[in-house]
Every structure is written in structure tokens, then in C-alpha cells.
């Protein structure tokens, strides 16, 4: 048996193999050590010939659904090796084979999957001129592809968040250099990533002559990535994939660009703080699993075209204004369940009888939804109603053939209703009317023998038998055969009982075979409805999301935004959708107005003390814009949203010191990416840029960036720039579309009260020392800090730092270039040369410290 194990293990050496032995799944050798640690099961040893032993750990086969998810979540690939024949029918070693390879990206097990999110497998192909990418969720059948530069593929990887990524063997350095090392990855042989093999695989799967019908024919690199995914499904023994019915192109030009920094800093999907909330958490009132998954997708793919946005808003408004319609849809959605994943299980042959019944219930619930949508005074709802397919024939067949409360597994029996098959009914009559028949035999034999206490019973050793107490054993007929002697009784069998037993047991076996055949035929018939039911699932998910928007709007007092094809962003009394939900009971969120356009107020510089709410104001502006462009109502009194095509944020950078990048380097990298990609329709948020360097460096860089955005000849991006550099307020005097605002505070009796209201004009104070006092800083330190602050302010006034030089900078911005080194001292020249030749981007922290030590030695003359 161990040879059999080793032969099968050699096919997938990197996977943990669950080896079926009777009623247990066993693991051996290093697999056993891994399984014991992850699953918390006992690690033992078994003899392995010639005095050797091998590690072993196992669990009962019925506990697979409990233990398999734990292995997958631990990032393991799991090969399930089952017995391919009944041990009772063979005297040789039981034939075994790998029936499924479950990986983080390839699973249809409900216990592995999260019902609120997709479980995507991705493949990346590094082409000569572009990078191809494909995504597949085998649990839903969604199959998508795209190609483009590395930054676009990086954005897709972060927005789709695949559980596993495939790429060509030997390309790990290229992958991690462009996309990082946070993903679970797997390398495949180079032949998998060839155009000929991929195209052939796709054409064979879709049974087409070309891929033009999918709109991906021109995506050479995307086709290669897509084909690699299908090859991987074969390798993992997932060959029944009839639910993968199309390959769709991810249309980049339809969606707002959100990079990974923006998704993270705006906390769209998850919070950056433990226990914090996200925008998704606030607006997700979906009912169905499909709706929850689609909403998560919408969050990171906002629309940028006016018509589809208004189509969504029209439906949300209809829900909002029609409470009876809303309640009807809500009630029916609660009955539908995970229609999308159930129909996928039909294709792969893993659908249970209970799931088939749930599918029937879902189809029944769709009927009133379809009727209501078709009758609604709303074109978008009418179109949804038209696309919903009642699948009446299969729905009625399920109703006719499957019991309403069947067992979970077909081999438990009792799945098929009475009256479906004559032979099945007859067999059931034989098998399940046994009690009456046995009672008649018992009564007859008792009367014939005169033994009143005679009884007929059954056990697995002797089958049916007659039990007679010792008091009456002299009355037993000679034709009875004694099988067992007990202390107070004897047990006998008769020819009649033996024949009846064979008849009953044969009937039970035949019932199971017949029920399985009838059920399989039904599932095969159901598979013909996969495309129609997938469309149903998509439309139900869409309705669910829009209903969720309406319920959130009603609950939180949101209004419908006005979507306009211009450059004006005019939000009146806007609120932060997440923060307002976290306020203590009775506390009201302080709403604010924000106006940005390309004519008079393109850039707003926001100053104000720490903790005043500058960052919240920036984020709320972006979140309101994003909510509007996914088709949701927004938290404001009114909102005119001039369509945005990109949202950029530079809000808070976490040090990446492990790869040699400081806070400042991260800031500059992110700022550079923004400035190289802005357009006239972009919304740009900068929060406290330049904190990671010296004050004057920070002011200079911040000034230059704001000036660049304002003076850009083509892309006048709408920008909010929050800063503690009050010197930037000088820019309003020299740049006509820059305006100063501040988040107001009030100082009473040497205490600061945060009013959190955006007001016109700059701010002169940061109140940092007041914040330190509020944080519980020792009084002696606060006192000393005030003394130092007064001295510094006095010195600056005397030296004229705050005003004149910056005004001169704005006047001489044409051809000014700073000279960093104007030195004559040879030692300083040597230091200059050392610094200028440093490759800062690739310098690690340890190397930086060593270089600093070298410079120190130069200064000391050593």
C-alpha cells in the first residue's frame, strides 16, 4: 500500500495527500507532520518494513469537510486520493486514484469558500510588449481576461484579490518585482504559456472556431493566460466545467481607475485598523450571496459613463419611492439562496438533493420578481424582468420528482418521490412494508407452536431470526435451524425468513441504484439550463445591489446625486459615510461643503490643526464621488458630480523598511505615480505630503507639486491638498485657481475646541502642543514646548522666513533651479560626491547606516 501511496504522491509532490484507507483519510511522512500541526490531530508512526517506521496522521472520512478548509486556509494544496472500487468486491489491493486536487484558487467546497466573496484563480503571462492576465472563479463560472502594462495588471490583481496566481516557472523574480510577494502563487511549465496550446484549449472548451464572439481575439497575452487556467483545471482533476460558458474582456475604459493605494487608504473593502469599519461594511445590505459578491466588485470598479450610472440610480430611486415594490422584492430575495454556486455544482456533478430543492425554490421566487419588474414604470427594471428565465419545465420536474425535504446525500435514500417510477414504488413496498409482513409471520408461528413470547428480530450477523425463551424450546419445530444460544433463550432461522431477508436486502440495494439513476438523469436535464440560470443569478445579484443602495439611503438619509458630464464637483453638506455611523448616540456629524472645478477653484489647500478633521474631509469627498459613480445615493444635502475618471490618494504611507524604502520614499513613489497619470477628470487627494523629510524640503516639494498640478497644460485635475505647512497659503496670491480653506477650531481658556467646519482662508496655527496636552503628555514637557515654540516664532519673524522668500519663489518659478552644493572645502566636496553617487532607491537600511559611518570617518579625517 505504501508503494501505491508513493506512486500517487509523486504526481503532486508539493501537495498534502489525503489517502483513503477504509473509513479514514490518512497522511504519511512529511504530509503527516504538516497535517498534524495544522489540524491539531495526533501524529503517530506505523511500520514501513525492514524495521523502519513512517509518520502517520489521519481523521474519519466524514470529517473531510471540517479538516479540508483548514489545510486550504493554511495555504496548502491538497490531493484527495479515494478508493476507486469497493473493498468487498476485491481480494487484491484496493485501486486508488486522485479524484481532486483542491488548491486555494480551485475549490467548490462550501466550507472552503466565503459566500460573500469570489474565489478567483488568476494566471499572469509576461509577454514582450504587454502582460496578460485572466481570472476564473470555478465556483461561479466567471471567466475574465485583460492585458496591459504592469501597473494595470497590478491594479487588477489587487481589486480582484485572487486566492492563487499561476505564472511561468522561472519568472518568480519578475512577478514579485512587479506585484510583490503577498499572493499565494504556483509555477507551471513554460509549454502551458504558449499561444498555440492556450488557443487550442479555449477553442476546444467553448466548441468554437475562433474567439471573436467573446471580444478577446486581439488579446494575445490575455488568451495565453486564459488557456493556462484551463490547463491547470485539467491538472487538478477538474474536468467537468460546463458552467464556464464564456470568456469576457475586462473593459478598462468603462471604469474609474483606482490603484491599490486608493482602495486601501479610502478603506473601501477593509479597514486599516483592527476592529475598524469600511465603506463596504456600511453599504452592504444585500440579501443574496450573489449580491454581496457583485457589490464588492462594484466597489472597486466604479463606472465613468453617465448613462449606466443614471440607469442604476433610476432603479435605486424607484425602490426608494415604492415601498410595496421594495418589500415584495426583499421577501422573494430571502428565498433564493446562492443560485450562482448551486448551478455551478450541477455542472461539476457535486450538487446535493437539498441544493436541487433550493434551486427549485429559487426559480419559484424569481417568478413574482420577474412579474413585478416587467410591470414597473422603469426601463432598467423592465430589461431585468425580460432577462429573467423561469425555467418552468425543469422547475416543475424537480417539484414532481424530488421530495421537499430530502436527505443531504443521494445514498441515504428517500430522495425520489413516490409515483415517479413504478419499479421503485414496488421495491419500496417490499422493503418498507416488512414490519407488517414480519408481524403476520410472528403471529402465525406463535399460534402454530403455542409459544406466546416468540418474537422475530434482526441483526447484522444472522439477519432475521426467531427468538424463543428456554422455557418453550421443547415446542420448537424440527425444521427450524438453531443459530445462537443465549443464557435464557435460543435463536433460530427458517427458510421462509431467509428468503424474505434476501428479498428485502435486494430491494434496498435496487432502490439505491434506481434512485441514483433517476437523480442523475434529473441533474443531467438540469445542466441544460445552466446558461439561463446563470443569467438569472446575474440579474438577481444586480437587483440585490440596487435594493441594498435604496435601503442604505433610507436608513442613513442619503440623497440622489446629479451626475454631469463636466468638471464641477459640488457637494453641499457632505458627510463621511463610515465615520457618521461610528459616532456615539446623540452626536451629530459636522457636514461640510466642497466645490472643485477647473475654472475658478481647481485646487483647495486645507490647513488646520492636527485632529481637526482634514483627512476625514478628503476621504469623504472621494467616498461621496465613488458612491455616486457606482450608482448609489450619497450622504449629503445635494451633490453635483462631474464625472471622474481616476481617483488618486496620497493619504498616509506605511514604512516599507524591509526593502529599504522609508516613509518619504513611499510618499515620493506614490506622488510620482499620481503626477504621471493625472487627467482633467481626475480627483486627487494629498494629505500631509512631505512629512518624511526636513521642513524646508517638505515645503519645497509640496509647493512644487501643487504648482505642477495647477500649471499642467492639459490635465487640470481637481485636487484637495491637506497640509500642516501654512506657508503654502501664500500660493493663493499667485495662482488663480488655488484657494485656501481651513478646518476651524476655537480656543477658549487656553483649550482647543475642534469645530470640524471647513471655512474660507488659511490657518496660522497647528495647535500641536494642545493636542499633546490632550494626549496626556507630562505638564513639564508641555510647558517647555510652549517656551520653545514662542522662541522659534520670534526667531522666524526676525529672519522673515514665513513670507517674503515664498512670495519670491512664486514670482520666479519660470527658470529657477536650486543648487544643492556650492562648496569649496575638499572634504565637503568628497562628501558631496559620496552622496551624489548613492543609489537611494536600492539602498537598504543596513547599507545606509554603513555609508553614514563612512561619511562620519571622512569628517573626522580617519
Swiss-Prot record:
Keywords: ATP-binding, DNA damage, DNA repair, DNA-binding, Nucleotide-binding. The keyword Disulfide bond does not apply. GO terms for molecular function: ATP binding; ATP-dependent DNA damage sensor activity; damaged DNA binding; mismatched DNA binding. ATP binds at residues 608-615. InterPro entries: DNA_mismatch_repair_MutS (IPR005748), DNA_mismatch_repair_MutS-lik_N (IPR007695), DNA_mismatch_repair_MutS/MSH (IPR017261), DNA_mismatch_repair_MutS_C (IPR000432), DNA_mismatch_repair_MutS_clamp (IPR007861), DNA_mismatch_repair_MutS_core (IPR007696), DNA_mismatch_repair_MutS_N (IPR016151), DNA_mismatch_repair_MutS_sf (IPR036187). NCBIfam families: mutS1, PRK05399.1. Belongs to the DNA mismatch repair MutS family. This is DNA mismatch repair protein MutS. It comes from Bacteroides fragilis (strain YCH46).
